[in-house]
Amino acid sequence: MCYGKCARCIGHSLVGLALLCIAANILLYFPNGETRYASENHLSRFVWFFSGIVGGGLLMLLPAFVLIGLEQDDCCGCCGHENCGKRCAMLSSVLAALIGIAGSGYCVIVAALGLAEGPLCLDSLGQWNYTFASTEGQYLLDTSTWSQCTEPKHIVEWNVSLFSILLALGGIEFILCLIQVINGVLGGICGFCCSRQQQYDC
């Protein structure tokens, strides 16, 4: 198995997932494409945690680019052996993957909390509050209650859709980074191959 090619594939996947996380998080600031709710601070508190922008986005780009460049990384070798240097590079990629695990974990946790609490919205009494906070997420299964939020229009659907996307994307990122931790350890211990013609064995 070529551990370097596997790492590079994971890296490219993480870049795409990170960009999607950033886009989903940005959309949370503009319900129905309107900017006034953000300027008036009438958004869910968990929107301001930047889970998709920072956790699933920017923090994910670090391990992504490390993994993408890993296959071309000749490292310095040790004792004149290039193979040793490549194995060290694979082991060091584990640290980058752990950063990715932390970022994606943060994204998943915040998205789950955002889904459980529900959106900040204007209720039928004309007050801005978290209408579904006391339902412990049960409102997700009872769409008939969503009409309790009168403004922003369709805010429940907006929040549920985007937080669900962040939850799914963060979960995929977490799994990929976990796979890279295993891949990096195996690659560091068992060897690293740079092409189909070259492979290092234990």
UniProtKB/Swiss-Prot annotation:
Protein's name in the database: Transmembrane 4 L6 family member 1
Subunit field text: Present in high molecular weight complexes in tumor cells. Interacts with SDCBP2.
Subcellular location field: Membrane
A cellular component term, taken from the record's GO annotations: membrane
Coiled-coil spans in chain: none
Pfam families: L6_membrane
Species annotation: Pongo abelii (Sumatran orangutan)
Membrane topology per record: Multi-pass membrane protein
UniProt keyword Glycoprotein, yes or no: yes
Family to which this protein belongs: Belongs to the L6 tetraspanin family.
Cytoplasmic side: 1-9, 71-93, 183-202
PANTHER family (UniProt xref): TRANSMEMBRANE 4 L6 FAMILY MEMBER 1, TRANSMEMBRANE 4 L6 FAMILY MEMBER 1-RELATED
